[in-house]
Amino acid sequence: MHRLILALVLLLFASPALAAEPLTLSSPEHVLSVQVSTDGDGRASYSVNRFGRPVILPSKLGFLLTDAPKFDRNLQTADAGRRSADDTWEQPWGERRFIRNRFNELRVALTETGGLKRRIDVVFRLYDDGVGFRYEVPEQPNLKSMRIAEELTEFVLAERGEAWWNTAFEWDREEYLYNRTPITEVGQAQTPMTVRYASGLHLSIHEAALVDYAAMNLTRVEGNRFKAALTPGITEAKVVRNTPFTTPWRTIEIADRAGGLYESNLILNLNEPNRLGDVSWVHPGKFVGVWWDMHLDNKTWGSGQRHGATTAEAMRYIDFAATHHIQGVLVEGWNKGWDGEWFGNGADFSFTEPYPDFDLEKVAAYAKSKGVRLVGHHETGANAAHYESQMEAGFALYHRLGVETVKTGYVSDALGARVNGDDGKVHYAWHESQSMAEHHLKVVETAARYHIAIDTHEPIKDTGLRRTYPNWVSREGSRGQEYNAWGQPGNPPEHEATLVFTRMLEGPMDFTPGIFRMKTRSPDGVPTTLAKQLALYVVLYSPVQMAADRIENYLANPKPFKFIEDVPVDWAESHVLNGEVGDFVTMVRKDRHSADWYLGAISDGHGRVLQASLGFLEPGRKYRAEIYRDGDSADWKINPYDIVIESREVTSSDVLQLRLAAGGGQAIRFVAEGGKGRR
């Protein structure tokens, strides 16, 4: 008996974590709560409840290191501080002008009880619609640096359900169709991953403020248990950092409905405020460009008889833009380096030397004389090392010519991107590696010095850094419209309704809508109706929005093109009236510079009728609804061009019945009576 008592006493003293009380935190309105605890081995975990119901079951925390013992056991927890905040900040541009930042925060110190006695803090920030947490590593004698092989962060989902996810660790970046599977059939997923529980609750797991760190993916380990899977680096360590440092925030948005995920400001709020100061030089706007013709194989990026980027062609597009109140013109293929194997190479690109048949100085001057902004283009072939050697000169040239926005590209082959290593050599790297995270931020910071905004294609994923760097205006990061030009297959009709609740939870998306001629090189062409192409300007958000078709197709259809002329790209408010992931969505947005509202509704491959209550309009005010809807015989397969354009008077008390064809949509401009309107 004495031996048993002695053994129990020794066990209690050897396991101090057993006596630790869980630490808890609630959101401002007590919607969400988080609990942090340790088990008998001193392993720390967190869990999340919503109105007392489990959302995330106990999920482990910690790190696996390449040059030191892993940090995951013999830990004790301590409350290292709490704080709350409730403030409102203004976006210089965006899908909504004012954003409330209201949260409660808990800092948990995780300290080893023996051995190296290292300490890593985990900071939990709890909003009513989501939770963010990150590791903060202080400088300490036994932890001067960290070589991270993997995070041991887990997300154990509390219910069965289904998930929408993009496969991780594929060579073609994010340009894949989303999988829709039961949670238990997810493999390796990129984030954001969207989940709908059987109870109807919606979740999105992602990250915020990805700076000098590898992007996080998710690996399903078993059942509903997921663990973080960092993107590999150019050495055995996926992340190398000196202390002190912080990781990106790990985020979980939580909402009753799919639309609540899109309406959440969690990702933006977790990023640092604007570091650039006055950014009045960042100008949202629409643009046309020498682009779609190349995807249709009518013209080429490289030199020759079919070269698209000629002086004459650029000036023709500038004339069109000036006549139709389009702010910018993009010209791709203007610079030397497109001939030969540029795909995944990029070493031959010059960012200052135009082809002989493109007079850059003349085109820029002509655009300025017409009140049109030239949109620059830097395709890198994912050769980040080569681009960094020239980008300063490239931005300086563009700045001198009055270019305010540059579209960058990182098209690569299966070998990935090329980056400079600390050893002075060029290495291949994943697009979302720590090296590429550093590269993209270097591009954005360099561009800012020249008052240039960046629209990144084939990008690293968006994690809300546009708040900190407002010149990072948009990214592609999805299977965009070009796949409808040549894809085998193209994008299916449900694609855009999926993107709203998956990719668009990251931030602005340059999808390039506005195709008016649906026949392409792809077997199904563009699988939408004409009305849906118009609706995409409201449904899909980007502050730099392209009217992507050939201008001949716009000249042949002036009445529907008027909606593209009228629709703004900078908003005061944005709301999802209804929607289900991959099925349909109705979005309304208020123009930042007038009293007008805009509505966009889209459907998948099924026709449907949606109700749209106009309660978002100002009470007591009349509006003229300019409606662009599918005709009675519209169908994306057999009659995509059947469109009806009509108008009626409405008020906030009205409810509209929106009839959407298969693959269809509806776009509406609500012009306020007595408002100043727009041009």
Report residues per predicted region.
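An acidic-aromatic substrate-binding cleft motif
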Residues: N242-H324, G328
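C-terminal beta-strand-rich structural cap/linker in extracellular carbohydrate-active enzymes
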Residues: S647-R679
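Aromatic- and carboxylate-enriched substrate-binding clefts and catalytic-loop regions
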Residues: G333-M518, T529
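Catalytic cores of secreted or luminal carbohydrate-active enzymes
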Residues: A531-L577
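Edge strands and adjacent loops of beta-rich recognition modules
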Residues: W89-R102, F561-M587
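Carbohydrate-binding surface patches
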Residues: V581-Y623, Q666-A667
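N-terminal signal peptide c-region/cleavage motif recognized by signal peptidases
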Residues: A14-S15
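N-terminal accessory beta-strand-rich subdomains and adjacent acidic, glycine-rich linkers
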Residues: E21-G277
